[in-house]
């Protein structure tokens, strides 16, 4: 699994540079996240702490569940996803690939859509996350898309699942709980995104571990 976390804030000085995808691939790896979109190269800067905290928390929580249930692979940026040939090169904050689609994972990138993508919004990524990527992920076959917006006075999480018509539909959150389709049996208390309780204990709750096991976990962490 990838261990480094995503960045989202775009720097555009005199407009993004233009180049072919092959030229983009040949760029030196200087530790910066770069996306290639419609022939433009987008350089990214380090995000805010809250962005990384949420990405890291989801990586631990989802990762525990996906590994325990043997459901597939989970990645965080920097990891390239090229949804379709000739399409944009994106580096989602978090992406999940199911066991059935592991053949899409190559040595350097994911060739094809992830089953689930999570983008955590920053001030500079609002248009990309809510508009550009929403349309792009919908058109290329992503099954589920979460948008987590931690900005002050805008704190919210939106969940979309692919409908029978192939379009994203807003998924229900009932009693503060969201249930995923792309990750079978996984559910999430939305408040956890902001509270970020211990990921192992929340995983134990999701997985339905007995009270005895949960108590043992708490004692080990005490």
Please give the residue ranges for each predicted region.
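Gly/Pro/Ser/Thr-rich low-complexity, intrinsically disordered segments predominantly at protein N-termini
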Residues: 1-222
